[in-house]
């Protein structure tokens, strides 16, 4: 008599096994090269300085982008967060700004990119939009709740906008994206920075695992802003993070992209392109500042 011992509680067909194998190959290839993934799967082309900031920020827990107006930091953040959420299961991100309206503007950038509403991105696909959990109350899955805009992917990754009511947002856990951080107060940062104070790889169970779980992607604090007042905490973080990066601490990354970089060094795959900023625009702003 022959006995058949099933390897899993659920039988999978050969076709289904092949689908899962191909899916795993694509996901793992994307984790190794997220720039390729965002271009090939999303149809989004980034400039070279954006690619550099993207890759250096991929796995580091503490990241700061100091970028001038027109450098495309919000667009870069939209692509970065979309890629990270799709490639990393159970990855939760909060958006923190100086007001609920600003958080919603960042959310809308991600939503518009996913739903192919940005004319300057001519080859965007619907792959990310198809990964958004539609639920039963939303046609697109992007929920516009007054208490906080949000959406969730089928892999249980989630993005939520935060209000400025500090008592209402205490105790949450997840990564945080700060936009226009130069004017955010120390009190507000102190509340949201505690969101990452948990080991993302920690887990318990009632049985011993016969395998080792993979190390999870660390939670991240990503500060993005143009330059502002040196009396706010963003300036102090810029100095501290820069020193740690220069000393070789691999947990920190800082990029400083000014108007000159955008004007004179805008390239795609090493080929110089026409900048979307002009010298006249930059001179006009400098005249106002002076």
Give names to the regions the model predicted.
Residues 2-290:
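Phosphate/NTP-binding elements of NTP-utilizing enzymes
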């Amino acid at each position: 008599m022959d006995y058949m011992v099933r390897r899993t509680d659920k039988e999978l067909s050969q076709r289904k096994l092949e689908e899962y194998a191909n899916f795993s190959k694509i996901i793992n290839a994307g984790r190794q090269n997220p720039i390729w993934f965002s271009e090939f799967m999303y149809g989004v082309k980034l400039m070279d300085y954006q690619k550099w900031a993207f890759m250096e920020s991929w796995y580091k827990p503490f990241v700061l982008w100091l970028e001038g107006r027109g450098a495309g930091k919000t667009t870069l953040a939209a692509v970065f967060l979309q890629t990270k959420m799709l490639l990393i299961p159970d990855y939760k991100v909060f958006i923190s700004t100086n007001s609920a309206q600003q958080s919603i503007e960042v959310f809308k950038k991600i939503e518009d990119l996913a739903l192919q509403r940005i004319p300057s991105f001519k080859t965007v696909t619907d792959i990310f939009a198809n990964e958004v959990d539609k639920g039963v109350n939303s046609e697109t899955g992007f929920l516009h709740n007054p208490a906080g805009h949000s959406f969730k992917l089928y892999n249980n990754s989630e993005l939520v906008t935060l209000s400025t009511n500090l008592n209402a947002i205490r105790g949450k856990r997840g990564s945080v994206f700060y936009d226009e951080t130069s004017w955010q107060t120390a009190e507000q940062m102190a509340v949201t920075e505690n969101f990452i104070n948990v080991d993302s790889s920690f887990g318990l169970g009632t049985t011993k695992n016969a395998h080792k779980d993979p190390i999870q992607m660390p939670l991240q604090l990503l500060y993005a802003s143009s330059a502002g007042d040196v009396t706010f905490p963003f300036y102090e973080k810029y100095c501290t993070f820069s020193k740690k990066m220069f000393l070789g601490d691999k947990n920190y990354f800082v990029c400083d992209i000014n108007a000159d970089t955008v004007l004179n060094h805008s390239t795609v795959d090493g080929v110089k392109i026409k900048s979307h900023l002009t010298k006249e625009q930059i001179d006009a702003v400098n005249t106002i500042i002076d």
